[in-house]
Structure formats: structure tokens, C-alpha cells
């Protein structure tokens, strides 16, 4: 993928408009409870400030009604936190689309919630042109919204004098390209989660590329059904058994594999107090719920991971939130941490597992995108990246 990158541009004295993803969780009082996304935006902002650029940053926050900016929609708490992290005050500019505000060289301002502007979500061309007129260089650093064609992620990139990827966006593109376009083999994908239906496209796409497709959670239960196993009262989608079988057949025809559990951890309920039993997969009873893979299966998965050249990880293999059902995900996480392979991981549950088992420093790249990460792996064109590609030659 060819896109211009911020690090390759001379931004000195230029007006730089950065679309970041500062959509952080807040409590009922509006206090920020987790600031990873704000921290992830700092390298691009600092790069521009250190070179005496005039820096404008905007982001969405939540799902405001266009044309309104209620108290819960404001980026004011973000401006305070950003200022603390940068060690300098960050002014919040409201009603900024028409311009009329001053920003000094070496100063950064935060432009109020971009989704409060009428036309943002529909990628309105007139709005995009007005925003493009505010800057000399447009920087997209919001990979988490790259799958959405909106005025600040797509339209502005068409009309700004220069359009480029920020530090974070560039790193995401590089890591995903490394994992998917010319990966070191064997290529192993781990896809966990509750439902095949939400991951069907990605499973089909990966089945055409990977050497091993490890499935976990409710997804694995549907594959077990397809292979003729009894799963008791486990979460599954019987109506998608044919699709699961087709994916296994596709893998087999390529000489690849979907390694299914030979033993499982079951209980009669999903709770912190549930009693866990380890049993062979052929002994699952009519009222059992499969909530994790067993130790033999975990060891097999760990061996597959140990021999991988590239690992793409999206989702746990068990209900790891409860310790008695965390063994499979824990062993898999440990295997990834000790692997020589390049690993890219993404998705909320995956990030929670990485945090729980303290392996963040051992993962090659942790993606900040949820839906964008999945759509990239599905092989879809992400509108925001496509817009940057279209401006590469300018």
C-alpha cells in the first residue's frame, strides 16, 4: 500500500490538521477511565509541534446527534488530558468548520467533536472542502475509523493540499501488510468469539491464505458440530454448520488445517463459581457447556504457534474472564509470547487477554482498530486508506 507518511514530510510552519481517534471511555461524571487512544495519538502531535507547525487535532467521541453538541459529547475532558500528557495547555475550539480562529506556530488546539458537524457521517463534500481549507497538510491517524467514509476520514483527504498517514496509521498499515501480503510461513490465524456469523467473512478469507486456522469460543463449537461432535448446551450456531464444513473442506483441499479440540473444559453454567470439568471431547454430556479447550488441545495449539512464522490473533479460545476457563487462552498467550513469529493482535477481547496475561511487550504489533482491523483482514478496501492511496502521487 502506497501512502504518504507524516515522517517523510516537511511540516515546519505549516497548518496541520490531524484526525485522531480520541474516543476514550468515560464514567458517568465524564472522567476518562482509560487513555490508551490519547497516548497513541501523541507521536504525530509531538512530531508536528517539535517542528513548529500549527497543529489542529479533532476526533469523534461517542454518537452525538449531528448539529448538536451536548455536555456528554464535548472533547473538553480530552483537551485537559491531552494537555497533561503534552505538558502544555490545549485549547478547545468550538464551531470551527468556518475557521476564524487563531493558532500559533508550535501550538496545538483541539477542534470540538467532529461528529457534531452536520454532514460528517455522510461524508458531505461541501463540509469536507471547508475543513480542507483550514490546513496545508491533512494527517489521518485514526485507524480505528478507517473503515468508515466520513468527512474527516475520507472527504477531507480528497481536497486537502497534501494528505498523509500519521505515525499510528502508518504503523498499522505496515504491520497489517507484513502479516497479510507477504507473510513469513507458516501463517497461523487465531479467530475466537461467540458467533461464526459475525466472523464468517474473515474465516472464509483467511481459509484461502493461512496454513493453520485456530478457532475458539462459540465459533469452535459450531465447527465441532460440523465435524459430528456432540456439544450439549454449548453456545453454537447450528444453522451455520454447512458454512463451517465448507471452511474446513477449503482448508483441507489446500493441505491446511482447522485443528479442533480433542479435550474440553465444561460446566453447567457460565459463572465465577461454576465447577469446571476437563473431559475428552467425545464425552460431552447433554447438559454440558464447553467453556474452554482442555490441556491436550492447549498443548497442541501451543506447538502450532511455536512453529509459526506469522500469527494473526483475533479472539480468545475460552471464557478467560473466569480463571477456571482461562487455561487455553493463557497457554496460547504464553506460546505467542515465546514465539519467534511476528504476531499482530486486535479486537477488544484479545486486548483484554493480552492485558490479563501481561504479554503486551511480547506482541509484534497490537492494533488499535476493532472493526477496521477485521475488515482489513477480510480483504476489504478501507475508505480512509483508499483516500490516502489516491493522493500518493500528488
UniProtKB/Swiss-Prot annotation:
Provide the residue positions that the database annotates as binding substrate: 21-23, 37, 60-63, 115, 148
**Keywords on this record?**
ATP-binding, Cytoplasm, Glycolysis, Kinase, Nucleotide-binding, Transferase
One Gene Ontology term of the biological-process aspect is: gluconeogenesis
Its subcellular locations are: Cytoplasm
Which residues hold ATP?
199, 321, 347-350
Signal peptide limits: none
What EC identifiers does the entry list?
2.7.2.3
Give one Pfam family, short name only.
PGK
**Top-level division of the source organism's lineage:** Bacteria
| Pathway of action | Carbohydrate degradation; glycolysis; pyruvate from D-glyceraldehyde 3-phosphate: step 2/5
Q: What Gene Ontology molecular function terms does this protein carry?
A: ADP binding; ATP binding; phosphoglycerate kinase activity
Gene3D superfamilies (UniProt xref):
Phosphoglycerate kinase, N-terminal domain
Q: Which GO terms describe its cellular component?
A: cytosol
* Reactions it catalyzes: (2R)-3-phosphoglycerate + ATP = (2R)-3-phospho-glyceroyl phosphate + ADP
Q: Which InterPro entries match?
A: Phosphoglycerate_kinase, Phosphoglycerate_kinase_CS, Phosphoglycerate_kinase_N, Phosphoglycerate_kinase_sf
- What enzyme class is recorded for this protein? transferase
Assembly and interactions?
Monomer.
| Similarity field | Belongs to the phosphoglycerate kinase family.
Q: Name the PANTHER family on file.
A: PHOSPHOGLYCERATE KINASE, PHOSPHOGLYCERATE KINASE 1, CHLOROPLASTIC-RELATED
Q: What is this protein called?
A: Phosphoglycerate kinase
